[in-house]
């Protein structure tokens, strides 16, 4: 490129590859698919250049198509020439250019804006003549003209001397972004007489935007034959990289057969299940938030208290935001410390220092490079490609000849900075630039058949209870284990006897305040009309022993001992269910059989639950083992809303505990409520017709010591992943994950109806945990062993339907518990997508999953596999692929295999399997994968100004690991520091 008449040409010029140096008209369409070459009018200034649409397959590590606009940012010619004159690389020149190489550098410093404008017009005239030539010139001249045309469209890439320049040389076409605010001092005419209409409406706003323009750099001194050969190879490579992946559609699950069955009777009417035929197919994919019904956002992060109780609301919870105080400062320091530790995937110190210097000088002129195929020696820094407006991970600054000199405020000041002594150094740099290094290709996961319904280790090979478990010790009460039955009288098939024989009352802040307690007083009027404190339990008995033939009778009975809420509680859902949903025969069976039996078992509470039930408070490691009959009595009391002190809001005594009384289940006209009531009445009918004989254990586990994730050297365990089936249906005998609210049960007693609430409905014995389990802290979980499934269902959220009664055939262990182990672990609720990639948030989720999976003192061969899925996604805002990787890492440290259910998402199934296979084949440790997660945040998410980063997590990991592997295999090189 010429600097115009009377100006000395650049001593360093950019090199262009074979695609750029071939004859323009002949190779333009081949080398740059989609590029539209314009014949520029000499009067047009400035010139607008169009960005070729890039394929998602060719752009390294990018998810989706190129986000550049078709009308890219207009670059001013003086700006380009200034960069070229100071930092350019030598290139082949035409005869007119060679005649100017002997000019004095003083002329370069005296260049004026007029001369620039003259050159601008001169250059456009040459570009205009390109389309009119017969292409009979020499290859050098043709390449020169084609070179000039593209030099007006993009910035020159300046490569530093030394190893860094060699690493930059290795890269394929970088995207160059010019920061327009930093050229405010350039003496260039900013007006444009003629241009497309798309640019005239955004002349002023264009200066505040950044666009990416693709530039090809190559060695112009190579012969044309070599260039043509490289061009052919580049076409072959691009064809492979751009090959579209076959779309794989997930198979839809078949709808559950409709059985005409009533939850109130084994021979119920046919109309109870009429809504099942039209129900939507099972959609358990919690990560599909976009199609969630209006209630789904309320249900999963449901508050166990009223809507005004912000403390108990997961959506309004402040606890989730307290995870990382000092969001930027604390995470920057912690992630920086981790990054300084030895690793196979550690970026080089030179690149780190360069990134720090470039990001700290916002007023300087910067070029942002997006690498497509190249790789730095550490193999990691080039993966970061930011959206416009974000800070790039690799900023190459314009520097003087010594690379560390003072920066001028004007680009034209650089013209006076090229001493003659630099000629020798430039020649040496030029020789280094000609050295080509092996390029690191983009990693593409192997193609997986779309017909596969599962991937990984066969589920039959996964460990299950009780076969993999050890023999349990004799059941005995201890300081950290409360047992409420006579262990000496425990027999198979017999109803356990309560212990002690007679009711023992403790009315304090360490135990559940029971409805039958003598301390449960209530203001009553005596015969003289005077108010006195009476027994509330006696009032409950009197109210419930009346005939409950109508829903209004049940409402009046409940409000008799809850007078304070007579004007607050709403029973619309209960009344509508009784009058509009149930058939006459079903309603008759309800008030003639089921409700009287429920009243009977509820009022037998002091004879069934004789031992005070301890509260499972925070920081406790304690277990409670009770009989299924005792749980049924407690839940019957919850249905009739008899538990005292559990209805107050805000800062009351039990404000840190979930709801237990069912009053919120009776309110409103939601279509969910009738189905929830059907499921619960099915349970009460079953347990009142035949007393259950098993035991259930509730364990609160609180950990103080967690792994140092960045130093963990354990390898990943086995994985089975499928898009069919459910956790409860196909994970028998495994550790089944409950995607819990920190108030266990979430909205099960109100409007919630997603994964956790559904599990609590079909296994209603889980609901009693809300009676004594305080809100979970970040280092805690709740483990429930022995609950029984009583119902089957179809649908999810708004489409949930009770289907039929279920006979649980799970085996029992030595303690007469069903071998169904459920762990409640609560994920964080992310209001911003990027927040979940903050290092401390990732550590918190790892620690939470690890807490749920760990069983201290139990060897790995005696631990069952973890049956899980899209934990913390859906309404909680989590990324399914990140959460899957987090659970895989936590399970590896806890020495458990993983069985992962994607709930109908076949693409997610293939992605998780491909990532797990990729990591295990390369024998990456948990610590190395954890460091990659930190790298992803630092390079892609920390400074991202858009809702989500351009490069997704899995492509980033693929490229990072593959790049490091390729670089390590090169002789004479080593990675990390």
Swiss-Prot record:
Modified residues annotated as Phosphoserine in this record: 69, 138, 198, 262, 265, 287, 292, 299, 303, 317, 449
Taxonomic placement: Eukaryota, Metazoa, Chordata, Craniata, Vertebrata
Effect of residue 738 to N: Abolishes catalytic activity
PANTHER family: POLY ADP-RIBOSE GLYCOHYDROLASE, POLY(ADP-RIBOSE) GLYCOHYDROLASE
Positions with a binding annotation for substrate: 727-728, 741, 755, 796, 870-875
Annotated family: Belongs to the poly(ADP-ribose) glycohydrolase family.
GO biological processes: ATP generation from poly-ADP-D-ribose; carbohydrate metabolic process; DNA damage response; nucleotide-sugar metabolic process; regulation of DNA repair
Subunit and interaction comment: Interacts with PCNA. Interacts with NUDT5.
PIP-box (PCNA interacting peptide) (motif): residue ranges: 77-84
Motif (Nuclear localization signal): 10-16
Reactions catalysed according to its record: [(1''->2')-ADP-alpha-D-ribose](n) + H2O = [(1''->2')-ADP-alpha-D-ribose](n-1) + ADP-D-ribose
Entry domain remark: The PIP-box mediates interaction with PCNA and localization to replication foci.
Bias type Low complexity, positions: 17-29
Organism, scientific name: Bos taurus (Bovine)
Single GO MF descriptor: poly(ADP-ribose) glycohydrolase activity
Modified residues (Phosphothreonine): 200
Catalytic residue list: 738, 756, 757
Name the UniProt record assigns to this protein: Poly(ADP-ribose) glycohydrolase
UniProt-listed Enzyme Commission number(s): 3.2.1.143
Keyword Transcription regulation (UniProt): no
């Amino acid at each position: 490129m010429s600097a115009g008449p009377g100006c000395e040409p650049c001593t360093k010029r950019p090199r262009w590859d074979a695609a750029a140096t071939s004859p323009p008209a002949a190779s333009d369409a081949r080398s740059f698919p989609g590029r539209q070459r314009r014949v520029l009018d000499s009067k047009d200034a400035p010139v607008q250049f169009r960005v070729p649409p890039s394929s998602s397959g060719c752009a390294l590590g990018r998810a989706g198509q190129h986000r550049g606009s078709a009308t890219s940012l207009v670059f001013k010619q003086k700006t380009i020439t200034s960069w070229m004159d100071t930092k350019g690389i030598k290139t082949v020149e035409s005869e007119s250019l060679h005649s100017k190489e002997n000019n004095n550098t003083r002329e370069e410093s005296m260049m004026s804006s007029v001369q620039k404008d003259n050159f601008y017009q001169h250059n456009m005239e040459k570009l205009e003549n390109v389309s009119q030539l017969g292409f009979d010139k020499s290859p050098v001249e043709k390449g020169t003209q084609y070179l000039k045309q593209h030099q007006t469209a993009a910035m020159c890439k300046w490569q530093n001397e030394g190893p860094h320049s060699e690493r930059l040389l290795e890269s394929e076409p970088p995207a160059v972004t010019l920061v327009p605010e930093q050229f405010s001092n350039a003496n260039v005419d900013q007006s444009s007489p003629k241009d497309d209409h798309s640019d005239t409406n955004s002349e002023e706003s264009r200066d505040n935007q950044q666009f990416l323009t693709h530039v090809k750099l190559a060695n112009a001194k190579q012969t044309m034959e070599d260039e043509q050969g490289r061009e052919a190879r580049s076409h072959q490579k691009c064809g492979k990289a751009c090959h579209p992946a076959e779309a794989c559609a997930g198979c839809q699950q078949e709808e559950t057969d409709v059985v005409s069955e009533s939850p109130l009777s084994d021979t119920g009417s046919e109309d109870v299940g009429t809504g099942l035929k039209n129900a939507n197919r099972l959609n358990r994919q919690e990560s599909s938030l976009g199609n969630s019904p209006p209630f789904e956002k309320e249900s999963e992060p449901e508050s166990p208290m009223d809507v005004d109780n912000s403390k108990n609301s997961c959506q309004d919870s402040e606890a989730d935001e307290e995870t990382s105080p000092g969001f930027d400062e604390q995470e920057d320091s912690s992630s920086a410390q981790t990054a300084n530790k030895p690793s196979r995937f550690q970026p080089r110190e030179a690149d780190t220092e360069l990134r720090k210097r470039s990001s700290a000088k916002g007023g300087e002129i910067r070029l942002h490079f997006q690498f497509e195929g190249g790789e730095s020696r550490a193999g990691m820094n080039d993966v970061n490609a930011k959206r416009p407006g974000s800070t790039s991970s690799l900023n190459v600054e314009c520097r003087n000849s010594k690379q560390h000199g003072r920066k001028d405020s004007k680009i034209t000041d650089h013209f006076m900075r090229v001493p003659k002594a630099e000629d020798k150094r430039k020649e040496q740099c030029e020789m280094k630039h000609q050295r080509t290094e092996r390029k690191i290709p983009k990693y593409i996961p192997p193609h997986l058949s779309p017909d596969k319904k599962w991937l990984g280790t066969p589920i039959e090979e996964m460990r299950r209870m009780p076969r993999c478990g050890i023999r349990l010790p004799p059941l005995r009460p201890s300081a950290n284990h409360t047992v409420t039955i006579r262990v000496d009288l425990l027999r198979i098939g017999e109803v356990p006897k309560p212990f002690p024989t007679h009711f023992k009352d403790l009315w304090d802040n360490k135990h559940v305040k029971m409805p039958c307690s003598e301390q449960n007083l209530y203001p009553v009027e005596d015969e003289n009309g005077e108010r006195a404190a009476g027994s509330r339990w006696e009032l409950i008995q009197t109210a419930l022993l009346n005939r409950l033939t109508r829903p209004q009778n049940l409402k009046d009975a409940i409000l008799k001992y809850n007078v304070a809420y007579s004007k607050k509680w709403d029973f619309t859902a209960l009344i509508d269910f009784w009058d509009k949903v149930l058939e006459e025969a079903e309603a008759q069976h309800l008030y003639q059989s089921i409700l009287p039996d429920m009243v009977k078992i509820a009022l037998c509470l002091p004879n069934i639950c004789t031992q005070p039930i301890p509260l499972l408070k925070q920081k406790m490691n304690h277990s409670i083992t009770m009989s299924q009959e005792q749980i049924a009595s407690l839940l019957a009391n919850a249905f009739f809303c008899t538990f005292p002190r559990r209805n107050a809001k805000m800062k009351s005594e039990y404000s840190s505990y979930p709801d237990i009384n069912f009053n919120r289940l009776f309110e409103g006209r939601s279509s969910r409520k009738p189905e929830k009531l059907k499921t619960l009445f099915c349970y009460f009918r079953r347990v009142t017709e035949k007393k259950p004989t098993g035991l259930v254990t509730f364990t609160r586990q609180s950990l103080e010591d967690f792994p140092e994730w960045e130093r963990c050297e354990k390898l990943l365990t086995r994985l089975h992943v499928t898009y069919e089936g459910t956790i409860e249906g196909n994970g028998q005998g495994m550790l089944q994950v409950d995607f819990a609210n920190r108030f266990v049960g979430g909205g099960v007693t109100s409007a919630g109806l997603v994964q956790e609430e559904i599990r609590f409905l079909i296994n209603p014995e889980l609901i009693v945990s809300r009676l004594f389990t305080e809100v979970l802290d970040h280092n805690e979980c709740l483990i429930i062993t022995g609950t029984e499934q009583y119902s089957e269902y179809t649908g999810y959220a708004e489409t949930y339907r009770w289907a039929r009664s279920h006979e649980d055939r799970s085996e029992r262990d030595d303690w007469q518990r069903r071998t169904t182990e459920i762990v409640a672990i609560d994920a964080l609720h992310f209001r911003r997508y990027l927040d979940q990639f903050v290092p401390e948030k990732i550590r918190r989720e790892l620690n939470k999953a690890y807490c749920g999976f760990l069983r201290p003192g139990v060897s790995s061969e005696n631990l069952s596999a973890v049956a899980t899925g899209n934990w913390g996604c859906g309404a909680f805002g989590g990324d399914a692929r990140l959460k899957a990787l987090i659970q895989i890492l936590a399970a590896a440290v806890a020495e458990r295999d993983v069985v992962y259910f994607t709930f109908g998402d076949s693409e997610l199934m293939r992605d998780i399997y491909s990532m797990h296979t990729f990591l295990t084949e390369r024998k990456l440790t948990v610590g190395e994968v954890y460091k990659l997660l930190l790298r992803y945040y630092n390079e892609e998410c920390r400074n991202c100004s858009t809702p989500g980063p351009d490069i997704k997590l899995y492509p980033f990991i693929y490229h990072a690991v593959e790049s490091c592997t390729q670089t390590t295999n090169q002789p004479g090189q080593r990675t990390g520091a």
